[in-house]
């Protein structure tokens, strides 16, 4: 990991931290996830192994790609491509919502990336604005830092469960262990209205409050989920809220078009078995109207190629810079400087630089000789022919025999250049990154969800859902201990 220069801290959590770094050889900016000492903590080791195995098989234009995996002193380091902008940043810049075409392009790529994960029997389970990166070219990258959260001011406390509650499907809230890919589709539905309107759809303050928000909009839970709710010891003594009058999406957001409302409703079906697959969503009228899907697919490929070229140009620029520095260094070393060494022979100390008046012919000869020589001499700018006297008493400070009668210039040892850059190591101290929060997010989200894992030993009742990426039960286990504490999952989609 010595080849990476640490540029600052991006986020941290109970299992490690994420750092912004620069590859010293190529100049490429990357994000490095640094786990805690995994060999001493079985939970950290399990999470690290699961994420490494999953990400190694995921290569897609709409997923942040894993570039390298390293282990040093019992710690695992995951090197990712770095993208420093998220959809959450957009929502904070535009609190009243994003433009229609922007949302269309974002959603198309989000669904495309999630669909790729689902095709590999992987569910993300933590789809939310801050986990969706956007490159400078507009390419969306789903990321899953899991334990990493944006740093905030000291004293603000939140749990990992609170941070993602707003986008959790009802089956997760009631404790259903037979959930599947439909939980990601639910999160997509939450994003649809949030990106258009600039406010979270279901901003619950607790699990029961979250269910209340959902039921107020979509109606009662399905019988199976109601039964699971009353059997769940977490909700002992608590009853589901009674909804006298619903506020459906079309009434809550009358300015949204019918096609947008229809897309959101399909994703937010209260019954997970009736939510569509990602492939079906991409064929929805929201994407097919006016030939958007076909047109944007071609545009997206150009954006991806542009990002790839930018990375390549960055590497070439860094290499050219290094070559130039090397050439400049060699050029400096090749220069012969006329410097009087105070520790040299006493006769040398008495050497003086004289301007000799000569004939015009002598001047022309001296000028020609000056052009032919690569040596650089100290001279009066008003004359082109200088002479050092006495030439026979000069000595070379580098102990190399030189015939000074032929070359009266003083030779000195080449200067020693220290070109090594002093850069902090990967474990050096890191600065903090602060992100300005505006609008309703200050009160509802930031105050509760800003400082990550201040109490890492305190687990939420539904803590079993806090791992961000897992696989469905159809495939072989990723590792012997990778799913010991996770709920079993079935294929629902």
From Swiss-Prot:
Active site: 126
Residues engaged in binding ATP: 10-18, 33
Residue ranges crossing the lipid bilayer per the database entry: none
The protein's Enzyme Commission number: 2.7.11.22
Entry-linked InterPro entries: CDK, Kinase-like_dom_sf, Prot_kinase_dom, Protein_kinase_ATP_BS, Ser/Thr_kinase_AS
Family: Belongs to the protein kinase superfamily. CMGC Ser/Thr protein kinase family. CDC2/CDKX subfamily.
Name this protein carries in UniProt: Cyclin-dependent kinase-like 2
Source organism (scientific name): Pongo abelii (Sumatran orangutan)
Lineage: Eukaryota, Metazoa, Chordata, Craniata, Vertebrata
